[in-house]
C-alpha cells in the first residue's frame, strides 16, 4: 500500500510521480504537487492501492535548515521506528519500503483499520446524500483468481469478504444441503447393538435409536470461521452484512485468539482439504484477513477508486448528521440564507436562561460551523465574522416571521409563517409584553477536529474545549479540563439581551470518534451523543455568561403597569439588560456586566429598579427557579402569595369575621 496525505505539498520525485499519476494532482511552478482527495484508488501500473489520508493527521513543525527556521508538515504524534530523526514527513512513508523503515507496527495497524472507517464513512455519506458531487467512485477491488498483484490492504480484504458473501449464497446452501443429507437416517447395526429394546404386543420398540455417525467436516469449519469474521466486522465497523446460516459462531474470546495468530495456524492445518475454486477462494480471503501480509488475488482489469473531493464537505456532513437538524427540516431562508450564505449546523434546543424545572421549556436556535483543519490550526478573523453574520441573519429572519405587515413578504416566506415548526421560538417577545425590547441569547459554536496521541477511537472525552493560552498557560476549568475559547461580540458591552451581543465558543471533537459513530450508523449511540453534546454546549455557554454577567431576578411591586411605565420612561438605561425568559412572565431577568468600569453604573440602576421591583439580593444561578425567593420578599412586605400545586379555588367572603375564621382553619 502507498500512502499520500491530503493537500500536502510534495516535491515532484520519482516515487511521488508514480503514485499520483492516476489522479491528475494540482501542481505549481516550483514543481510541487498536492492531492485534494481523501480515500483510495488502485493503480494498475503500480499493482497496488494508494491510500490518501486526511490532513487532520498532520501538524506543523518548525525546524532549522542551514540556520534558518522553516515550518514543515509532519505526522502528528508519531516518532520514527529507528534513526536519529525526531519526526516523520509524508514523503518518508509514500512507499512500502519507507513505511517499513519508519512506521511502527502499531501505526501500520492503525492505517489498515482507519482505511475501513474512511470507506464506511464515504459510503454512508454518498447514501445519505445521493446527489452529492463530492464522492467519486468506480468498482472496488474484488478477490478472484485472475491477474495477480501485490495489493493487500485491510480494505481490500474486508471488501472481498463482504462481496464473497453477497455473491455466493448458492454455494453455501448447496454445500450445507449435501453435508446434511442422510444425517437423520437410523444406523440399525449400532442401534441393535447399543440400544435397549422393549417388546410391546409382539413389536420391538427402540426408544433411543442411533443416527448415522457425524464426522468432522472441514467445509463447515471454514464456513464457521468465515461467518465469524463477518459478525466481527458487523459489530466493529457497523457493516450490515447478512449472515443467513445458523451456525454457532466463534465466541468473542475464541475469536480474539484467532486474531492473535491461531486463525492462520488453523487455516494452514486445513488448507489441503479444499478442491473447488470457490472453497479455495474463500480460504484465501479468510487467511488474508488473519495475515494482512498475505498476497491477495484481486481482479485488476480496470482502475478502481473511492475518493472524496473537498473532504471538508464530508466532515461537515458527518458533524451535521451527529448533532444538527437535517437542513430539509429547517425552514427555507433560515439555514440556506438569502444572501447566499449557508449555515453548516443548526438545531433548536433549550434556551440558556430559564427555569430548568419548568415542564414547558422554551427553545432557541443553536448555530454552528465546522472547521476542518490540520491539528493545531487556529481560527482566522474572517471565520468569526462570518459566524456572526449567520447569527444576525437568523435573528432578522425570526423577527420577520412575526411581523404583522406581510405586504412585502414573498409567497415563500408567507408559507414559512404558516407552517414553520420553529415558529414557537421567539428571539424577541411580543411588542406589548417586551417593553424593554430584550432579545434572547443565541449560542454559536465552532467545531474543529483533533486526534488523540494514541489514536484512540472512543475516549472518555470525545469533545472538549479548544485550548487557548492566558499568561503562558492553557486555561482550565474547575475540573482541570480545557475551557473552550469563547468570543463575545457586542456593540454595547453591558447589554447581554441585545441583538448585537453574540456569544461564540470553539470546541474540538475527536475526529476518529466522529468517523466511528458516523460509519456505524447505530441510532441509539448517535442519539445519546447528540443529547450529550447539545447539553454540553448549553452548560458551557451558561458558564461563560455567569463569568461575564451577574444575573438577577426581578418581580414588579404592586401595580405591574407602574413598573412597565418606569421601563418605558427609562428605556435607554435598561435596554439590553432585562428580559422575560421564564414561564411566569411577571418575573424579569436582569443581567449586569461584572466589569469594574460598570460597577457604579450598575449599582445606581439596581437601586433605582429596586423602587419598582423586588430584586434578588445576590445573583442567581442560571437554570434555577427564582420565584420562591421573590415571592418571599413580597410576603415580607405584607402581601401573601401561595403556590398551589393542585389548582386555585376562588370564592366570595361576605365580611371580615368570615375571613378571620377562614384564616384560623389554616386550610387555604
Residue ranges and their predicted role:
Residues 210, 411-427, 461-488:
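Surface-exposed intrinsically disordered loops and tails
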Residues 272-275, 279, 283, 287, ...:
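Nuclease catalytic cores
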Residues 1-265, 278-296, 300, 472-630, ...:
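Terminal, charged accessory segments of proteins
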Residues 643:
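Short beta-strand-centered aromatic/proline hotspots
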Residues 323, 345-347, 351, 364-376:
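Conserved catalytic cores of phosphodiester-cleaving nucleases, focusing on short active-site segments
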Residues 306-310, 331-338, 354, 373-385, ...:
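Short, contiguous acidic/charged loop-to-helix segments that flank catalytic cores in large enzymes
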Amino acid at each position: 500500500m502507498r500512502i499520500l496525505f491530503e493537500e500536502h505539498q510534495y516535491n515532484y520525485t520519482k516515487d511521488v510521480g508514480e503514485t499520483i499519476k492516476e489522479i491528475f494532482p494540482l501542481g505549481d511552478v516550483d514543481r510541487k504537487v498536492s492531492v485534494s482527495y481523501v480515500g483510495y484508488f488502485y493503480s494498475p501500473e503500480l499493482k497496488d492501492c494508494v491510500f490518501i489520508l486526511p490532513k487532520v493527521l498532520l501538524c506543523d513543525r518548525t525546524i532549522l535548515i542551514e540556520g534558518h527556521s522553516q515550518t514543515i508538515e509532519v505526522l502528528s504524534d508519531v516518532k520514527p521506528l529507528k534513526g536519529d530523526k525526531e519526526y516523520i514527513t509524508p514523503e518518508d512513508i509514500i512507499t512500502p519500503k519507507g513505511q517499513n523503515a519508519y512506521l511502527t507496527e502499531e501505526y501500520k495497524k492503525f492505517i489498515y483499520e482507519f482505511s475501513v472507517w474512511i470507506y464506511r464513512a464515504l459510503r454512508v455519506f454518498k447514501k445519505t446524500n445521493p446527489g452529492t458531487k463530492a464522492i467519486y467512485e468506480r468498482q472496488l477491488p474484488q478477490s478472484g483468481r485472475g491477474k495477480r498483484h501485490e495489493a493487500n490492504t485491510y480494505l481490500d480484504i474486508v471488501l472481498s469478504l463482504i462481496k464473497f458473501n453477497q455473491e455466493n449464497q448458492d454455494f453455501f446452501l448447496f454445500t450445507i444441503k449435501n453435508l446434511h443429507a442422510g444425517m437423520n437416517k437410523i444406523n440399525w447395526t449400532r442401534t441393535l447393538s447399543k440400544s435397549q429394546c422393549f417388546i410391546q404386543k409382539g413389536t420391538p420398540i427402540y426408544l433411543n435409536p442411533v443416527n448415522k455417525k457425524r464426522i468432522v467436516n472441514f467445509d463447515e469449519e471454514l464456513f464457521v470461521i468465515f461467518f465469524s469474521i463477518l459478525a466481527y466486522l458487523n459489530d466493529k465497523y457497523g457493516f450490515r452484512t447478512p449472515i443467513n446460516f445458523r451456525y454457532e459462531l466463534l465466541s468473542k474470546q475464541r475469536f480474539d485468539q484467532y486474531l492473535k495468530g491461531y486463525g492462520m495456524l488453523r487455516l494452514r492445518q486445513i488448507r489441503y482439504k479444499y478442491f473447488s475454486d470457490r472453497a479455495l477462494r474463500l480460504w484465501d480471503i479468510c487467511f488474508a484477513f488473519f495475515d494482512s501480509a498475505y498476497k491477495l488475488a484481486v481482479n485488476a482489469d480496470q482502475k478502481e477508486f473511492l475518493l472524496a473531493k473537498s473532504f471538508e464537505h464530508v466532515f461537515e456532513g458527518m458533524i451535521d448528521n451527529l448533532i444538527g437538524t437535517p437542513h430539509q427540516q429547517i425552514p427555507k431562508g433560515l439555514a440556506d440564507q438569502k444572501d447566499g450564505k449557508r449555515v453548516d449546523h443548526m438545531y433548536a434546543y433549550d434556551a440558556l436562561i430559564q427555569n430548568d424545572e419548568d415542564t414547558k421549556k422554551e427553545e432557541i436556535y443553536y448555530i454552528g460551523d465546522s472547521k476542518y483543519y490540520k491539528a493545531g490550526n487556529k481560527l482566522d478573523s474572517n471565520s468569526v465574522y462570518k459566524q456572526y453574520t449567520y447569527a444576525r441573519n437568523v435573528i432578522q429572519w425570526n423577527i420577520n416571521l412575526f411581523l404583522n405587515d406581510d405586504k412585502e413578504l414573498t409567497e415563500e416566506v408567507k408559507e414559512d409563517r404558516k407552517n414553520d415548526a420553529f415558529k414557537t421560538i421567539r428571539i424577541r417577545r411580543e411588542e406589548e409584553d417586551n417593553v424593554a425590547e430584550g432579545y434572547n441569547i443565541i449560542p454559536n459554536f465552532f467545531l474543529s477536529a483533533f486526534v488523540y496521541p494514541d489514536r484512540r477511537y472512543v475516549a472518555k472525552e470525545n469533545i472538549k474545549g479548544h485550548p487557548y493560552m492566558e499568561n503562558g498557560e492553557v486555561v482550565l476549568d474547575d475540573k482541570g479540563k480545557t475551557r473552550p475559547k469563547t468570543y463575545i461580540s457586542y456593540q454595547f458591552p453591558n447589554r447581554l439581551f441585545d441583538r448585537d451581543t453574540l456569544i461564540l465558543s470553539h470546541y474540538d471533537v475527536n475526529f476518529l470518534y466522529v468517523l466511528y459513530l458516523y460509519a456505524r450508523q447505530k441510532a441509539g449511540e448517535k442519539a445519546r451523543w447528540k443529547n450529550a453534546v447539545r447539553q454540553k454546549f448549553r452548560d458551557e455557554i451558561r458558564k461563560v455568561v455567569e463569568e461575564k454577567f451577574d444575573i438577577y431576578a426581578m418581580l414588579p411591586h404592586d401595580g405591574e403597569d407602574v413598573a412597565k411605565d418606569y421601563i418605558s420612561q427609562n428605556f435607554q438605561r435598561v435596554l439590553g439588560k432585562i428580559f422575560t425568559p421564564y414561564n411566569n412572565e411577571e418575573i424579569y431577568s436582569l443581567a449586569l456586566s461584572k466589569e469594574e468600569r460598570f460597577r457604579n453604573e450598575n449599582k445606581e440602576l439596581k437601586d433605582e429598579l429596586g423602587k419598582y421591583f423586588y430584586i434578588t439580593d445576590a445573583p442567581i444561578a442560571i437554570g434555577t427557579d427564582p420565584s420562591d425567593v421573590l415571592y418571599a420578599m413580597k410576603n415580607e412586605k405584607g402581601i401573601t402569595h401561595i403556590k398551589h400545586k393542585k389548582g386555585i379555588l376562588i370564592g366570595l367572603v361576605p365580611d371580615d369575621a368570615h375571613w378571620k375564621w377562614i384564616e384560623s382553619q389554616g386550610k387555604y
